[in-house]
Design a protein with these regions (language model features):
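Membrane-interface junctions at transmembrane-helix termini in multi-pass inner-membrane proteins
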Residues: 6, 133-161, 182, 343-374, ...
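Membrane-proximal transmembrane or re-entrant/amphipathic helices at the cytosolic face
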Residues: 439-486
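Helix-loop junctions and terminal segments of transmembrane helices
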Residues: 57-73, 148, 208, 263, ...
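Transmembrane helical elements of multi-pass membrane transporters/channels
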Residues: 7-23, 162, 187-203, 217-286, ...
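Signature of the first transmembrane helix
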Residues: 4-68, 93, 97-103, 132, ...
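Interfacial segments at transmembrane-helix termini and the short loops linking adjacent helices
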Residues: 107-128, 316-353
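Interhelical loop/hinge segments that connect adjacent transmembrane helices in multipass membrane
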Residues: 1-5, 181-185, 197-241, 280, ...
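Hydrophobic alpha-helical transmembrane segments
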Residues: 156-205, 374-379, 392-413, 453-457
Length: 486
């Protein structure tokens, strides 16, 4: 792949992984300072705000797509796109603020099981909770605009600073003023506002914006017509990603949900590299011609398999020992088998997502949305049958079956050459199947480590044989290293 793309992938990967470490460092301090119940309540508040992300209406990605396409035009279209998206999301954000004000009151008072003292604290925070919705809506437009310009260093710098503000400012308020939610929630919203200001300043610089422009209704309609399909696709994905836990809970009980959700939450952390690639590739696909975007897709899929598959092999062997140390022997025995199956699902979903963003950027986003909704009832049926016949393992197999369905559908609609893509995928998948079987039937850590290393080396060798680009990279490295060695 192009050096600029590899650089942007590395930047986006760093931008995704740094907030994880910040959260890991601050969560114990929050729990210690607020108490477990208050911390649980504030997480319910953020979850409630998160549901209102639907009010973005897919406009942030539509903005990214349209700005990427307009980058080379010097006709002022970028500013018109930005301001139309900005005012649209501001309006839906204000509407969301009104809805969450009343919705949060009903939820806290009549639905959620919250102690009366904490209820009062949340109700005192309601105006701040409402303000958080338009702040988030506008911030997504800023993110989409910067992404469309491929200014990823600027974006991730602002995001990292924003994450630090969001984690540390409420923490300071907690210890210096009061652990009350009436103090911590406003501090968090102020942090979000400051982060939005920084992101907005960066957006104005990246786009060269010098003044405010009126929104244009034709542009708003165009953005909405594009974004609505992304919204529908996101909705189908949101249902699919929670449906397995809901069905497991209704058929097998809450204990089985814990055995399933624990490895699921763990293995989804492997998504960082595919997510970094998607963030990088979407604007580039949008700005490129169809032929160039197709060539980039082939390169991206080969790169993802080469870089990601060895990591997945390590995860397959390391999952059970990690769960055993982290949560005990019973959790490892119950969760590791289904966790390994889910790892393969995450691996294949990363490839599917690259093809899906290609379709969204270059073809018709409606096709991706239709695949999501058509596959949903089929997935529900397969999930129910899998759990009924095979329990948790059946649920994991159903998830993997859905990723294969998505993979095949997106490959068809992307109009890429299927033979080299499927051959490359199947070769890497074979290594993962062998790793899964070995990890399932082996108890010796030393034996698992030896076979794991052998499979990683073998997989890298397969990538070397399959990828002419990788062979060129190795040749260049050899030319650099051998003279210095002499």
């Amino acid at each position: 792949m192009e050096k600029s793309l590899l650089k942007n992938i590395a930047i986006n990967f760093a931008g995704l992984i740094l907030p994880v470490f910040v959260s890991l460092a601050t969560v114990p301090a929050y729990i210690h300072g607020m108490g477990i119940e208050r911390y649980g309540v504030i997480n319910l508040v953020w979850a409630l705000i998160g549901y209102f992300s639907v009010l973005d209406l897919g406009i942030s990605m539509a903005t990214e797509n349209h700005i990427a396409k307009a980058r080379d035009a010097n006709d002022g279209s970028i500013q018109r796109i930005f301001w139309s998206a900005f005012f649209l999301n501001l309006a839906t954000g204000i509407a969301g603020a009104v809805m969450i004000w009343f919705g949060a009151y009903i939820y806290v008072v009549h639905i959620a099981t919250i102690a009366p003292a904490f209820q009062r604290e949340v109700l005192q925070s309601l105006p701040w909770i409402a303000v958080a919705v338009p702040i988030a809506n506008v911030s997504w437009v800023f993110s989409g605009a910067i992404g469309g310009m491929e200014k990823f260093t600027l974006y991730n710098t602002n995001q990292t600073v924003g994450t630090f503000l969001f984690q540390l400012l409420p923490l300071a308020a907690l210890y210096l003023i009061s652990p009350s939610l009436a103090v911590v929630v406003p501090a968090a919203v102020i942090a979000r506002f400051l982060a939005a200001l920084l992101l907005g300043y960066g957006t104005f610089r990246a786009l060269g914006i010098t003044g405010i422009a009126k929104p244009e209704w034709p542009l708003i309609r165009e953005l909405f017509n594009y974004g609505r399909w992304l919204l529908l696709f996101s909705g189908a994905n949101m249902i699919a990603t929670t449906l397995d836990r809901v069905v497991i809970g209704s058929m097998l009980g809450a204990k089985s949900v814990a055995y399933y959700a624990t490895p699921q939450n763990l293995v989804t952390r492997l998504n960082l590299l595919p997510s970094a690639m998607l963030r990088t590739l979407f604007p580039r696909f949008s700005a490129s011609g169809s032929e160039h975007a197709g060539a980039l897709s082939h390169q991206a899929l080969a790169f993802l398999n080469c870089a990601f598959t060895p990591c997945v092999v390590v995860a397959l062997f390391g999952l059970a020992p990690f769960l055993n140390v982290w949560l005990g022997h019973e959790m490892a025995v119950q969760s590791a088998p289904v966790g390994r199956v889910l790892v393969i699902g995450v691996w294949l979903a990363g490839q599917s997502s690259i093809m899906s963003v290609l379709i969204q950027a270059k073809a018709n986003p409606a096709q991706v949305a239709r695949v999501g909704w058509i596959g949903l009832p089929v997935f529900a049926l397969v999930l129910w049958l899998g759990i009924r016949w095979y329990g948790l393992l059946g649920a994991g197999v159903a998830v993997v079956a859905k990723t294969f369905f998505d993979y095949a559908a997106f490959l068809y609609f992307s109009k890429l050459k299927p033979q080299p893509i499927v051959r490359n995928m199947a070769g890497h998948l074979l290594f993962l199947i062998v790793a899964t079987l070995c990890a399932d039937y082996m108890d010796s850590l030393s034996s698992m480590a030896a076979i794991g290393v052998a499979l990683v080396v073998g997989n890298l060798g397969w990538s070397y044989c399959e990828s002419s680009e990788l062979r060129e990279v190795v040749a260049r490295l050899r030319q650099r290293l051998l003279p210095s060695a002499g």
